[in-house]
Amino acid sequence: RKKNPELSCWYSPADFHRFTKIKFVQSKFEPKIGAISTKQWSTLKGTEFPFSEHNYLNALEESSCVGEESGWLPCHLTLWEKKQLQGAVCLYEKYNGYGEYIFDWGWANAYEKHGLNYYPKLVSAIPFTPATGLKLLVHPEADTRNVRKKLLEEALLCMRSRNCSSLHFLFITAEELPVFESMGFLIRHSFQFHWKNNFYQDFDEFLGSLKRKRRKEIIRERRQIQQQMINVEVLEGEAILVEHINYMYE
C-alpha cells in the first residue's frame, strides 16, 4: 500500500468581496448533463477521465443514483463562446454529506451549534467516487488560466444565488491547485491508501512482502471464507444477466 496525497478545497461566502468578476463568455447552469451534447462535452480536457465521461455522469442521473432522493442535485456549469463549449464544472447542490469521501461533519456540527445552516452546500465532485481528476474542465484551445478563473467566479455566484453555505471541490489535481490558491480557497490535504501491484509472481509472494501480523490476518480471513463454503465467481459481458443486476441492487 502507498499513501497518496489528496487535495480538496473549500470556500465560504464571507470572503466573496475579494473578487471582481472576469468578463468572458456566456455561462449556463444545466440541471441535467444530458442538456449538454456528448460531442461538445468530450472536447474538454479532463473528460477522458473515466468518471468525468458524459455517458457515466448521464447514467448516474438516468438511473436516479444522482438526484433529489440521494441528496445530489445537478447544476452543471458551462461556459460558451458563441456555440463552442469553452469550459465546464460538474456541480451538485448537496443536502447531506454522504457519498463524498471527504468528511466534513465537524463543520456541519459547528454551523448547527451557532444556529447556522450548513446545507445546502455546493460541491464539485464525482458522486460516490473518491478518485482524483480534473474538476475545472477546459477546451484545449481556450485560455486555460482565464477559463478556470471564470469557472470559479461563476461557481461562487451560483453558491450565493442558491443560498449555499459554501463551495467545495473534492479530489482536485495538483495542476489545478494554483488557481484555487490564487482565489482564496482553503486547501485541505488528506491521504488515501492505494494498493500497487509490484508484479508478484503469485499470491504467496505478495504475502511474503507483508509484515508478519498482516500476513497472518489475511491467511486467517481466507481460511474463514473457505470454511463457510463461500465461492467467488467472476462474470463478464453477456454472462451478466438481469437477475444478477437486480440481486446486486437489492
Residues of each region from the PLM?
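N-acyltransferase acceptor-side catalytic subdomain
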Residues: N4, C9-S12, F16-E250
